[in-house]
Design a protein with these regions (language model features):
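Conserved N-terminal segment of class I S-adenosyl-L-methionine
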Residues: 1-106, 119-126, 142, 154-166, ...
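Short phosphate-binding/catalytic loops that engage adenosine nucleotides
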Residues: 68, 133, 176
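A short beta-strand submotif of the Rossmann-like class I SAM-dependent methyltransferase core
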Residues: 106-112
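Phosphate/nucleotide-binding beta-alpha loop and adjacent structural elements of enzyme active sites
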Residues: 164-175
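Conserved helix-to-beta-strand junction in the class I
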Residues: 127-131
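Conserved beta-strand signature within the Rossmann-like core of class I S-adenosyl-L-methionine
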Residues: 132-142
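A short acidic, helix-capping loop that chelates divalent metal ions and anchors anionic groups
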Residues: 145-152
Length: 213
C-alpha cells in the first residue's frame, strides 16, 4: 500500500502524513508492552499470536524474545522490508482484506482498525473472526466526527472516529463475544489517559463460547 511508505513511518509530521518520526526498534518500550499483553490477556506460552498490522514487526520480535510463537502481517511493503532479520519468515506482506495466512489463538490489533474505511470494517472484522479464537484490540475513539484526542487527527490514514460502544457493536455483528470493553487501557496507553479519559478503547473478544480465565 503506497500510503504507508517511508515518509509515513520516518517523516510523518514533516510530510503531514502521520505522527511517526524515525519509526524504530525500541526494546525498552516494546518488550514491556508485550509482557503486559501476555499477562493481562492472558496469553499462554503455547498459544499462537498474529500481530495484525505489524508494521516493521517489532511486537512480533518482542513476543518471540519472550518465548511466544508470534507472527505478523501488514499491507505496507516498505514496513515489511524494514523488519529486523530476527523476524524473517515470521512477518509477511498481505493485500488489504485478504484472507489471513493461518489460524491463531490470538490476534492483536493495536492502533490498526481505525485505518479501515467504514465501508470495509465489517468485511475486515469477519476476516479476523475467521482466523482467531480471541482478539485484543486497542483503538482511538471519537464522537463520530472527530477524535477525542486531537493528535490522532494528524494521521491522514485514519478513517473511523467512533465511540467504544460503536466498536463493540461491530465486533458483535462479526460474530465475536465481548469479554472486556473499557476506556482504561492501564499500562498500554498511560501517556494518553490524562489527555482524555475516553480517548482510547480496549476490547477483548472471543469467537468460542468461553471466558478468559
Amino acid at each position: 500500500c503506497l500510503m504507508f511508505d517511508r515518509e509515513y513511518f520516518e517523516q510523518g509530521p514533516m510530510t503531514g502524513k502521520s505522527l511517526y518520526t524515525n519509526y524504530r526498534w525500541m526494546p525498552e518500550l516494546t518488550i514491556p508492552l508485550c509482557h503486559h499483553l501476555v499477562t493481562e490477556c492472558p496469553i499462554r506460552i503455547d498459544d499462537t499470536i498474529l500481530d495484525f498490522g505489524c508494521a516493521k514487526g517489532y511486537i512480533v520480535h518482542a513476543l518471540r524474545l519472550l518465548g511466544y510463537e508470534a507472527y505478523g502481517v501488514d499491507i505496507s511493503e516498505y514496513a515489511i522490508s524494514q523488519a529486523p532479520k530476527e523476524v524473517n519468515g515470521y512477518v509477511q506482506l498481505i493485500e488489504p482484506y485478504a484472507e489471513l495466512p493461518g489460524k491463531y489463538t490470538w490476534i492483536i490489533a493495536k492502533d490498526i482498525l481505525e485505518h479501515i474505511p467504514y465501508d470495509h470494517i465489517d468485511e475486515q472484522l469477519s476476516i479476523l473472526h475467521d482466523a482467531t479464537d480471541d482478539i485484543i484490540v486497542m483503538v482511538p475513539l471519537g464522537d463520530g466526527t472527530k477524535y477525542h484526542i486531537d493528535a490522532y487527527e494528524k494521521d491522514i490514514t485514519h478513517h473511523i472516529r467512533e465511540p467504544l460502544e460503536w466498536w463493540s457493536d461491530r465486533f458483535k455483528h462479526a460474530g465475536f463475544g465481548i469479554d472486556i470493553e473499557t476506556h482504561d487501557l492501564g499500562p498500554f496507553k498511560s501517556n494518553w489517559q490524562g489527555i482524555h479519559p475516553e480517548g482510547n478503547g480496549l476490547i477483548l473478544a472471543y469467537k468460542n463460547e468461553k471466558t478468559f480465565a
